[in-house]
Amino acid sequence: MTYLRSIGLSLLVWTGLFLLNGCAPQNEFAVEESEETVTITTENYQLQVEKGGFRYRFEGPEGDVIAPAHPESGLQMGPSSGSLAAVTSATLEERTDSAVVFAAQTDGGLEARVRVRPEPHAVQMAVRPKEDGQYDVVGRTGGLSPSYGLADHAAFGGGAWDEGVRPRPELTGFEMDPLRGYRMTSNFVVFPQQGFAEVNVEPGDKVVRLTETENLQGSRSVRSMPALYYFVGSPEQIYQAFLEVRNREGFSVMTPKYEWFGVGWEAFGALSWNTTQETVTENINQYLDFGFPLEWMVIGSGFWPSGEGEFDEHGTPYGADAQSRDADALLATTSFGMWDEQKYPDPEGMIDSFHEKGLKVTIGLRNGFIPGGPFTEEGIKNGYFMKGENGEAKLFEVGFPEPDVYLLDAENPEAVDWYMDFWQKWADYGIDGYKEDLFGYPDSLPDDFFDPVNEAMMKDSVYVMGRNNYLGSPVDIHRYNDFNYNQPQDRGPINGLAFAYSGFPNVYPDIVGGTGLATDRFGEAPESKLRTYLMRYAQYAALNPSMSFGYGPWNYGEEVVEVTREAARLHDRLQPYIYSNAMKATETGFPHPMTPLPLAYPNDPQVYGLADTTRRSYQWLIGKSLLATPLYGDDYARAESRDVYLPEGTWMEYDSGEVHEGPTTLEDYPLPVGKTPLFVGGSGIVVEEVEGELKGRLYPIADQAETLFYDRDGETQSTITVAGPDWEDPTVIDQSTGEEVPGTWRRHAYEFTLTPGHDYRVE
């Protein structure tokens, strides 16, 4: 199934090929044809196509092989009702200023045109069979490894989302046809060691095969495969080119908002279904009284009109029969401005009070409409819901709510506008944003079925926490699947790293403590284990781009409060630094807020075997200056140390200030509960917020360094340059005023007050 989004890519049909309508970067290239090959040469790579089998390989400027040709053929095609056949011959038909066009034919006589368009660090292949119809089309090279990406699929593989976990984010051996089944979907794959990557832009059925002998991506049941991209270059160059492709193809990467990168709170984790104005207010106040620096909150459960006592503390809504007609109609988050009046007697006053405390208030929201609901008939009448083969609005079984629902047709711009009008009912109460969390829907839906709604919300400055997504980033932060104590704990860091590899670095690792502690709905666990679980989870989450809390740590004693609060305060201090790196990711595509080490050090062989369920050295860079080394995984309750790998350079322990020279492995490095699992290195420049002031922190790591800092508005910039200072007595000059800025040594760094928009030089 292939269709055009209402936004983004505009396609024209010309000589039987899809052509991009503007926007594509131009690239100078030379074409050389021999009897057997066609060679396309650019400044950065060479693409050699063998006419027999359309076998293609990528080489570097010096002739080194980057990606080998497939041993049989580069393309396979066939009618969707049949089997794939290898392309056996290809001829050069045309060379234009922007592309090279081939005529290709399979051994069964199927003909197609193949348009190859070189870009500075990318190649687009568009394959269109000559005759109308529905086809399966794949492109393939020889095998490459190691490989990374695929978002949720890299964490779960083909396993159940709440039980399975792949042993590592590395993908060799992964095969799925079609690629489906999870909510956060990307078929972008990167090979850092080779300086290579690929993606077949297709929200419908996709094929991915990554074996020792074959690297394959393709589309099922399509008229054409117009956007198979290969990328060549350094990781930074690859992700910049991938960003341009995502935005150009209509899968936008949008500017995130600052507050989401602070510490949050979720009602479902804290209270399960027992949410009322009173319980929500009380729980938030408890966190604030204990000194937790909350900045955002989600009321995602139990706020809609319901029957008396329907969702009490130990109830479950998934199989519950509604006790009133209203509850039956509104057993979902699409109640749009309709609160349970007994549970939430003054929602506007409640929201105002949270705003006065400095919190952004968000609500749970999905796109499913229940038959008999107050807005459903209007949606059916106007054709705003997804339709079945008979052309009528279709009911879908989903994970929540219990009744089957109609799903918004987000490819219909009028339906999205209608939905946005309903959203305004929440905004009128002062709600700042929403948590998108539809699940359990048929995996036959296109992967981008929710993206246009999220994009419309973001354009309207709504705060959006996303879960369902394909390829782009039309949200502020990306949450991975519910992460509870009864599940494999290695899945969390593998999931987060896979998001980052896939170009989704604004990772939110779900609620510290998950969603089961308030009710024991996942079974009981020893309290001593749960105490350790909360502390380890908090320390792990604090080093992610966003974090939140649910069930109160005070329920498990003073030590748990102290450790989790310190983790929250660490994240709060680092929020400006994390957000600045999120802005860099938005501008460059490179996953700066959470950088897997193979992307930062692609030529270091030691970084490729760290993250797996045996070694559990789950490490990543936060920007250029911080190395996260959390102790997490299935052994969280018993482990006290990890083998920590420090890449090339000088690294300082965050707590003690002890210095190490890399590359080196700190074997059995002690990481007891409460120790900050963080090293400072790289540029040694970090910006923190302390008591409402921005502080530039200069660690004596590098004598020559520079960093660009984005303030909370995402636009105001400051450059900090370290230029051979005397670390015994450094001098900071505000280059915007020419004045010296006073500073002091604090926590192993020289610290000064930073004014947003001013540039600084350290001498």
Regions found by a protein language model. Name each.
Residues 37-258, 268-271, 277-278, 284-289, ...:
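Catalytic and substrate-binding clefts that recognize carbohydrates or anionic sugar/phosphate headgroups
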Residues 267-268, 298-300, 359-372, 434-444, ...:
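Aromatic-lined carbohydrate-recognition surfaces of secreted/lumenal glycan-active proteins
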Residues 256-444, 474:
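Aromatic-lined carbohydrate-binding/catalytic grooves of carbohydrate-active enzymes
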Residues 21-22:
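C-terminal motif of bacterial Sec signal peptides marking the signal peptidase cleavage site
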Residues 372-381, 442-451, 467-501, 506, ...:
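Substrate-binding cleft/loops of secretory-pathway carbohydrate-active enzymes
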